[in-house]
């Protein structure tokens, strides 16, 4: 509906250009917003005030002129001018009902799909050396939610799990694995549960033994030169690490697969060429033996230009080099229209610099959008980064285990007679959903406090509340199995029916915001409001006990569309729904 009003206003502006009211080359960004006070209509725009200077007319006079020139629309019941020149639109109830009716049988719930694009999404991307920890959660689940929404809206999405599978630390790991093999024979296997212990032991050996450190550095050189033995050990280690990652992804309900892994090592062969191409364009400068690029727009507090280090004095490459190679690949090979990076906000300057450099060096097409969608930190209840009681990093699997245990206790307390298998399955869904939703419901750019007590509450904007809200709506149809709705029509008469209908009609607008800004919390807020709108409707408007069949069938259709929207919205967040709780 919002996009429809915007389209009417766009046509009006074109008419003004033809009439000479506005200059022929005039361009305006039309903003249409939902009103908070329904006495002011359903939608409003300040377009008249925006056009005042260009048209040379006062806002109220211009507002009336806009209304007089609006194309006729069955969706608009009336239009009014308010205040200094706001234009308020009242949506026709029957037109809204028809829109909702069509949405019920549509796989996209009546949403008009945008022009499809090819969109690369870089997310999760853990370093392969240690087990995934809580610091990997946000990128993984925020990125996955946006990916799901992009695909639902018809875009071609290419997932890129840019894992850290290369670098000098692998010499240390390979050297330690080599020692273990020497002690235990070729049959020695590194178990997934040993990843943290293995890494810490290797680091300890590296710090304490000069001989070990020398061997580690030697192995880096051999690995980079393609030594078969080193590459074999390296592949084994990465395979173990990736197996662990994908076990976590499966538990989280994340859609990443092995086929989506395109890590740092994938660009090894391109790094030398990146350096040569930057040098050929005269962009490289020598600084303390390193090859760097200075860009005038990036300076420190003292006003000195900040370097992007491309190659270290010892010949080694850095993240910037790999990122530039990845950007070129995503532009020239993957043909991306947009590339979205879900990476910690603390990397903001890095991405600003490499995005600018990639454009400057023509590594990417000018029309390709590079977007760093950064996120804040998950903190403990003390307001500091989430840690174990001993100050260590919290493993993601341990966090999920704890969530499952607490969810099981919660579900059992509410269903003491339920069988263990059903309890376990419900607890699995509730526990994982609670962790994911607690994160996704927060503004991506904000830090937030992690609290099991809050996230497992059945009150407020939480996963348990929404999962229960869905089962409540779906439960209506368990009591209405013999009712034929094939000829039923939605009729909006009661104020609460209209409120619910208006909220349902906003789903497409919400999903557009999710994919435009990478903000799943907007969808979470919408689903919470939708559940509240349904609750108000259900209390005020008897469904199965309606006054007549026409009213009952209409309200059942509204309930069905609510269930469909809640389920689809939760699925786009990567959250399973339950039929009972």
Swiss-Prot record:
Principal subcellular localization: cytoplasm
Subcellular location: Cytoplasm
Self-association and partners: Monomer.
Listed InterPro entries: aa-tRNA-synth_I_CS, Arg-tRNA-ligase, Arg-tRNA-synth_N, Arg-tRNA-synth_N_sf, ArgRS_core, DALR_anticod-bd, Rossmann-like_a/b/a_fold, tRNAsynth_Ia_anticodon-bd
Record field: catalytic activity: tRNA(Arg) + L-arginine + ATP = L-arginyl-tRNA(Arg) + AMP + diphosphate
Record protein name field: Arginine--tRNA ligase
Biological process according to GO: arginyl-tRNA aminoacylation
Enzyme class: ligase
EC number: 6.1.1.19
Ligase keyword on record: yes
Family: Belongs to the class-I aminoacyl-tRNA synthetase family.
Keywords: Aminoacyl-tRNA synthetase, ATP-binding, Cytoplasm, Ligase, Nucleotide-binding, Protein biosynthesis
PROSITE patterns xref list: AA_TRNA_LIGASE_I (PS00178)
Span(s) of short sequence motif 'HIGH' region: 126-136
Protein species of origin: Shewanella sp. (strain MR-4)
Highest taxon, organism lineage: Bacteria
């Amino acid at each position: 509906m919002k996009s429809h009003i915007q389209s009417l206003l766009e046509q009006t502006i074109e008419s003004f250009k033809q009439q000479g009211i506005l200059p022929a080359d005039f361009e305006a960004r039309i903003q249409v917003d939902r009103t908070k006070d329904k006495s002011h209509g359903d939608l409003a725009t300040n377009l008249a005030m925006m056009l005042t200077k260009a048209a040379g007319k006062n806002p109220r006079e211009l507002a009336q002129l806009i209304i007089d020139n609006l194309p006729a629309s069955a969706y608009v019941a009336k239009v009014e001018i308010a205040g200094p020149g706001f234009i308020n639109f009242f949506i026709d109830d029957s037109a809204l009902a028809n829109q909702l009716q069509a949405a019920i049988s549509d796989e996209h719930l009546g949403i008009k799909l945008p022009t499809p694009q090819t969109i690369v999404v870089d997310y999760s991307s853990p370093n392969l050396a240690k087990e995934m920890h809580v610091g990997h959660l946000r990128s993984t689940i925020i990125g996955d939610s946006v990916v799901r929404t992009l695909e639902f809206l018809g875009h071609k999405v290419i997932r890129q799990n840019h894992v850290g599978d290369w670098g000098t630390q692998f010499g240390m790991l390979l050297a330690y694995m080599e020692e273990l093999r020497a002690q235990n024979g070729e049959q020695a296997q590194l178990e997934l549960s040993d990843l943290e212990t293995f890494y810490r032991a290797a680091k300890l050996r590296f710090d304490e033994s000069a001989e070990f450190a020398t061997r580690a550095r030697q192995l880096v050189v051999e690995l980079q030169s393609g030594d078969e033995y080193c590459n074999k050990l390296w592949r084994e280690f990465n395979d173990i690490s990736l197996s662990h990652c994908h076990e976590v992804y499966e538990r989280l309900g994340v859609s990443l697969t092995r086929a989506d892994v395109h890590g740092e090592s994938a660009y090894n062969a391109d790094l030398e060429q990146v350096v040569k191409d930057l040098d050929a364009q005269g962009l490289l400068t020598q600084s303390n033996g390193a090859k760097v690029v200075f860009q005038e727009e990036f300076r420190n507090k003292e006003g000195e230009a900040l370097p992007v280090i491309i190659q270290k004095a010892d010949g080694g490459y850095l993240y910037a080099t790999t990122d530039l190679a990845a950007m070129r690949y995503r532009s020239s090979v993957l043909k991306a229209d947009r590339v979205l990076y879900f990476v910690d906000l603390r990397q903001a300057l890095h991405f600003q610099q490499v995005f600018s450099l990639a454009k400057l060096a023509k590594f990417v097409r000018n029309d390709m959008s590079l977007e760093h969608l950064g996120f804040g930190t998950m903190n403990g209840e003390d307001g500091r980064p989430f840690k174990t009681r001993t100050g260590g990093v919290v493993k993601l699997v341990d966090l999920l285990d704890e969530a499952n245990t607490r969810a099981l206790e919660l579900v059992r307390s509410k269903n003491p007679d339920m069988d263990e298998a059903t309890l376990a399955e419900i607890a699995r869904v509730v526990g994982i959903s609670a962790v994911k939703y607690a994160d996704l419901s927060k503004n991506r750019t904000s830090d937030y406090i992690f609290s099991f007590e809050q996230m497992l509450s059945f009150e407020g904007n939480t996963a348990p509340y929404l999962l229960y809200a869905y089962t409540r709506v779906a439960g209506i149809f368990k009591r209405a199995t013999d009712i034929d709705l094939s000829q039923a029509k939605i009729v909006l008469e009661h104020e609460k029916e209209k409120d619910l209908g208006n909220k349902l009609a906003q789903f497409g607008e919400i999903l557009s915001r999710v994919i435009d800004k990478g903000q799943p919390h907007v969808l979470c807020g919408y689903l919470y409001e939708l559940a509240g709108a349904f609750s108000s409707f259900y209390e005020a408007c008897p469904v199965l006990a309606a006054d007549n069949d026409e009213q009952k069938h209409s309200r059942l259709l509204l309930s069905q569309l609510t269930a469909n929207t809640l389920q689809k919205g939760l699925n786009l967040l990567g959250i399973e729904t339950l039929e009972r709780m």
